């Protein structure tokens, strides 16, 4: 099951983790991440996976009505970058959405992800996103956990600071230890070939 995941690069796994952060505002669940990783390895494009994410009830519940485009852009920024858009950024993305371009609300999220990592983007935005990806990967890949409520809690604890990153990793470790306990127990799904440093390039 999910044999293709072990063939993916660290960069590809990071790209998938970013989708969970941006579309669901949580860490990935291991089962879902490994499923989509297998689909990616078998040739499904990241764009197609992103479209599938956008159609999920979890995304719809998070972003609400798309009639409020400024609110939509603001929520994407908060999930991906941990901040509100500045006036120039808001104006740019609204023009893109409303100006007849090929960018749709579904692909706008990917565009903002790409912008955060671009050389022209801010270093603070790139670092914030990279740390959320690290936290999400630790939860789902290193620890192999799939409880969605725990995935939400771990990500919500992150505020951009180094302390909150360490706290989130410690929280994942505590959840893992509880899941491994004979007294409490829990579902763990770790795959051979996807190691402790899943985003090494």
Regions found by a protein language model. Give the residues of each.
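Substrate/cofactor-recognition hotspot
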Residues: 1-201
């Amino acid at each position: 099951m999910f044999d293709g995941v072990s063939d993916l690069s660290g960069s590809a796994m990071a790209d998938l983790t970013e989708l969970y952060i941006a579309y669901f505002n949580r860490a990935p669940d291991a089962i879902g991440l490994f499923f989509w990783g297998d689909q990616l390895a078998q040739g499904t494009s990241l764009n197609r996976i992103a479209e599938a994410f956008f159609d999920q009830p979890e995304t719809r519940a998070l972003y609400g009505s798309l009639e409020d485009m400024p609110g939509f852009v603001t929520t994407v920024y908060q999930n991906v970058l941990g901040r509100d858009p500045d006036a120039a950024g808001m104006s740019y993305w609204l023009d893109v959405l409303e100006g007849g371009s090929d960018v749709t609300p579904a692909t706008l999220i990917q565009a903002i992800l790409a912008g955060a990592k671009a050389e022209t983007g801010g270093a603070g935005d790139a670092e914030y996103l990279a740390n959320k990806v690290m936290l999400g990967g630790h939860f789902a890949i290193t620890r192999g956990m799939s409880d969605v409520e725990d995935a939400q809690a771990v990500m919500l604890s992150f505020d951009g600071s180094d302390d909150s990153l360490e706290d989130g990793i410690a929280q994942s470790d505590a959840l893992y230890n509880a899941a491994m306990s004979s007294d409490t127990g829990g579902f763990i799904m770790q795959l051979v070939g996807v190691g402790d440093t899943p985003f090494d390039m």
